[in-house]
Curated annotation (Swiss-Prot):
Membrane topology: Single-pass membrane protein
Primary location recorded for the protein, binned into one broad class: membrane
Species the sequence originates in: Streptococcus gordonii (strain Challis / ATCC 35105 / BCRC 15272 / CH1 / DL1 / V288)
Membrane-spanning residues: 8-26
GO biological process: division septum assembly; septin ring assembly
Known role: Negative regulator of FtsZ ring formation; modulates the frequency and position of FtsZ ring formation. Inhibits FtsZ ring formation at polar sites. Interacts either with FtsZ or with one of its binding partners to promote depolymerization.
Key words, A-Z: Cell cycle, Cell division, Cell membrane, Coiled coil, Membrane, Septation, Transmembrane, Transmembrane helix
Entry protein name: Septation ring formation regulator EzrA
GO cellular component: plasma membrane; septin ring
Length: 574
């Protein structure tokens, strides 16, 4: 045997040994993997999913929750019956491949099994999460059902405890309670029979009906109490009060009070129908309307009661007030008669007094009629109050008119005295002004002064003549006095101006002598001013001529003389 053959045999033997060792190692590794996969499968299979499914199933889910549960339950059934069986078969098949040293197929099978287990693990996790969510949701739903039942039971107890306070509404309330009870029964039937969607709809409606009926039950007693007790009691008191007022002699402007009482009774009776039908908004509206009508009647009665008190006070006070205004009128008439002997009065005052007297007589008739009939009132006190208040207001106006007229009459004699005093003063002023002008030794008196003086004298003479009449016309006196006052004022002003211009002109003419000898313009102005002064007696123009000429050669000279004159001017001493 050659060395080459020996080496070949050794190589082959070594290769076989190595192959065997490798096969043993691979087989062992695959067995380990398969054991691990088997263990994972068993853990998944042993999870308490069945218990969780049964727990949810026993909750009697409704609506969408039940639909969702069925979907996840079916998924779990598929997993437990099919997926786990497939995994088990695949593991068995992989073990066969591994035991027969078909390692490639075994490896492929192991990878496939691992993928299957991963998918199953993910699906189980999703199923369990979904079941947990359903459990939470069902807890809420169960609480919802229990809450609805609790509300319903409380409502039943509340109504049963005191049916009387619900009045005619109790029958309809009990009927609706029975309807809600029927809805609960229908809900249970549908939920048990596997119609969750319809059952959920019924539960929604039932909850809404419970809430609506609860609101009604809470609202009805107050409406019933108002309609059954409050409003009838008010109406009874109102009718009783009305009868007493009528017996006491009260009358009313409104003639339909009895029919309004009847209508109120009818409205109260009819409103029970709204309550019986649970038309609570209508019932509340009708209660409000009834209350407003009762208030309106109450206002009518209180108006007349208040008016009666006012009428009594007016009947007590107006006669004295009327007497007072009549006395005022008599006094005015006496004053008119007295003054008419001394003064020419306009017909307006006399007519006014006569008109007031006639009106007072008419008002007296109204007052006396109400006072005499006070023991037997024949009309509503509010109408009597209106008439007496109008009378009182008119008496106040008449009194104001009497005061105004009295002041006018009183002013006649005051105006007469004032005119007599002032006419003497003005006569004295005329004499004083005349002497004042004479003392000035002027070359002549200006026409403006003479015109004002003679006008003032004539007006003063006219005023004296009017005041000396047997019956003085005081209106003419006041007019003449106003004219004389203005005349004296104008004359006094004119006098001061004439004297001022004359004095200043004389001073400036004398002052101009210092310039006349060498200034031709001053000489000419001097001659012109002197001519106007001595021949025309226009002292203001004369002053303007000489002052303008001097201002050219000596600016400010005029104002210096004017200022000096004003400081030393002699006033007219009246």
């Amino acid at each position: 045997m050659s060395n080459g053959l020996i080496i070949l045999i050794i190589v082959i033997a070594v290769a076989l040994i190595l192959a065997y060792v490798a096969a043993v190692v691979l087989r062992k590794r695959n067995e380990t993997l398969l054991d691990s996969l088997e263990e994972r499968k068993e853990k998944l299979y042993n999870l308490p999913v069945n218990d969780e499914v049964e727990a949810i199933k026993n909750m009697h889910l409704i609506g969408q929750s039940q639909v969702t549960f069925r979907e996840w339950n079916q998924k779990w059934v598929d997993l437990s019956l099919n997926s786990f069986a497939d995994i088990e078969n695949n593991i068995f098949e992989a073990e066969g491949y591994n035991n027969s040293f078909r390692f490639l197929k075994a490896k492929h099978a192991i990878d496939s099994i691992e993928s299957q287990i991963n998918l199953v693990e993910e699906d189980i996790e999703l199923i369990r999460e979904a079941l947990a969510d359903l459990e939470k949701q069902e807890a809420k739903n169960s609480g919802r059902v229990l809450h609805a039942l609790e509300l319903f039971e409380n409502l039943q107890v509340k109504v049963a405890e005191d049916t009387e306070k619900y009045g005619p509404a109790v029958q309809e309330i009990q009927k609706q309670l029975q309807n809600i009870e029927s809805e609960f029964s229908q809900f249970v039937t549908l939920n048990s029979s596997g119609d969750p969607v319809e059952a959920a709809d019924i539960l929604d409606k039932t909850e809404n009906h419970i809430l609506a009926l609860t609101h009604i039950v809470d609202k009805v007693p107050s409406i019933v109490t108002e309609l059954r007790e409050v409003l009838p009691d008010q109406l009874e008191d109102l009718e009783s009060g009305y009868r007493k007022l009528v017996e006491a002699g009260y009358h009313f402007v409104e003639t339909d009070i009895e029919s309004r009482f009847s209508q109120l009774h009818s409205n109260i009776t009819q409103n029970y129908e709204n309550i019986a039908a649970l038309e609570l908004d209508n019932a509340q509206y009708e209660n409000t309307q009834i209350q407003e009508e009762i208030n309106a009647l109450y206002d009518i009665f209180t108006r007349e009661i208040a008016a009666q008190k006012v009428v009594e006070k007016l009947q007590e006070n107006l006669p004295a007030y009327l007497k007072h205004t009549k006395e005022n009128n008599q006094h005015l008439q006496s004053e008119l008669d007295r003054l008419s002997k001394m003064y020419l009065l306009s017909d307006e005052e006399d007519e006014k007094v006569r008109d007031l007297q006639s009106e007072l007589s008419a008002l007296e008739a109204v007052v006396l009629a109400t006072v005499e009939d006070s023991a037997e009132n024949k009309q509503a006190y509010s109408l009597t109050q209106e008439a007496l208040e109008a009378t009182q207001e008119r008496l106040k106006e008449i009194e104001d008119e009497q005061i105004t007229l009295g002041e006018r009459l009183e002013r006649i004699e005051k105006d007469d005295d004032n005119a007599r005093q002032k006419v003497n003063i003005y006569i004295n002023k005329l004499h004083t002004i005349k002497r004042y002008m004479e003392k000035r030794n002027l070359p002549g008196i200006p026409k403006s002064f003479l015109s004002l003086f003679f006008t003032a004298s004539d007006h003063t003479e006219a005023l004296l003549t009017e005041l000396e009449q047997l019956r003085v016309n005081i209106d003419n006196v006041n007019l003449l006095l106003e004219n004389v006052t203005n005349d004296i004022h104008d004359l006094e002003t004119e006098t001061y101006q004439i004297v001022q211009y004359a004095t200043l002109t004389e001073q400036l003419l004398q002052y101009s002598n210092r310039y006349r000898s060498f200034d031709q313009s001053i000489q000419e102005a001097f001659n012109k001013a002197l001519d106007i002064f001595e021949n025309q007696f226009d002292y203001e123009s004369s002053f303007e001529v000489i002052s303008q000429a001097l201002e050219v050669v000596e600016p400010g000279v005029t104002s210096r003389f004017v200022t000096s004159y004003e400081k030393t001017r002699e006033n007219i001493r009246f």
